[in-house]
Amino acid sequence: MKFTQMLTAIDTHTAGEAARLIIGGIPKFPGKTMAEKRQYLETHKDGLRKSLMLEPRGHQDMFGAFICEPANEEADYGIIFMDSSGYLNMCGHNTIAAMTVAVECGWVDVPQGESQVKVVQDTPAGLIHGTVHLNPSGDVEFVSFENVPSFLYKKDISIFVPSLEKEVVCDISFGGNFFALVSAEQVDLDICPKNSEVLCKIGMEIRDGLNQNVRVQHPILQHIAGVDEVEFYGPAKSKEADFQNFVAFGDSQVDRSPCGTGTSAKIAFMHAKNLLNVGDSVICESVLETKFKGEIVKECKVGDYAAIIPRISGTASIVGFNTFLIDPKDPLKQGFLLK
C-alpha cells in the first residue's frame, strides 16, 4: 500500500473545544506574512484541511491548526487556524492549546525552576504574546495571552431573522475575528446544550443576513472582512462566572469553549459601553459552563476606532498523538460531511 501523505498531529481540547494541531507531514507554505501563507494554503492546499477536519478523520464541529514556520522572526512558530468550513485569522482556544503544547512538548525552552514561560506565535491577525504558567512540578497550569487590539465596530444594528419572523438588534465587535453580539433574551432562549441546535440555526441566519446587508471591513488589515461568528450572551449559570455565551460559526458549528476571540470582542464591547475599565476582568462561561478569564490590559487605537488589548486565560489538555495517512486510491480521501 502506498500513501501520498503522512500527517502527524497532537489532539487537544481547550475548555471542551477541539484543537487538532498538525505538526508534521505538511509542505512549506510560501508567503511573506501569515496572511499570505493562509491564502496560499486556502488556494492550493485546501485538500489538507478537508482531509483532517472532515469525516472520517474529523467531524462537522472539528477545529484545528497547521503549525508552520513563522513569517515574523520574533515568533516561536506560525499558526494557521482552520475548521470544517474554512480558515480563521485568529482563534483563542487554539492559541491556548498551541502554547500549552509548545511547553509540554519542548518547542520552547523552559529554564529550570521558572514558573512562567513566554511564548510568541505568528497568526494571520498578527503576533500573539503569551505566558504559560507552570505549577511547582513544572507542568502547565494555565495559559494567558494578549490578544490583538479589539474594538466595537458597529452598534445597534437591526437584522431580520427568518425563523423568528422578527428583527433582532446586534452589535459588531472585533476580537481577532468579527462577531455579531446578540443578547439571548432577544431570541427567548436559554443558553444550554439542549438549545444548541436552534441557537446555532438562528446564529447562522444572523451572520448571513449581516454579511448580505452590512459592510464589515477591518480598518487596517484588508484581508479581514465580514462577520465570521455570532455570539449570544446571557446571565451566568455558575456563581464563579459573570456571564455566559454561545458562539456559532463556520458551517453551523458550535464552540464548546467560551471562545477567546469572542470573549475579547465582548469585553471590548463592554469597555465601549463604559461597563469595564482598564484593569478590570470578567469570567465568561461557555454552553458547557467551562470558563475563560478576560482582562483589559490597556487602551489603544485601531485606525479611528477606540480599542483595547485584552488578555485571555484558560487551560488546555493533550488528549492524543495521531498519525494520519492519505491513500490516493481512497475515493473519500479529502473527507465528507454527512448532516
Task: Give the ranges of each region predicted by the language model.
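A glycine-rich beta-to-alpha transition motif near the start of alpha/beta enzyme domains, typified by
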Residues: 1-173, 180-339
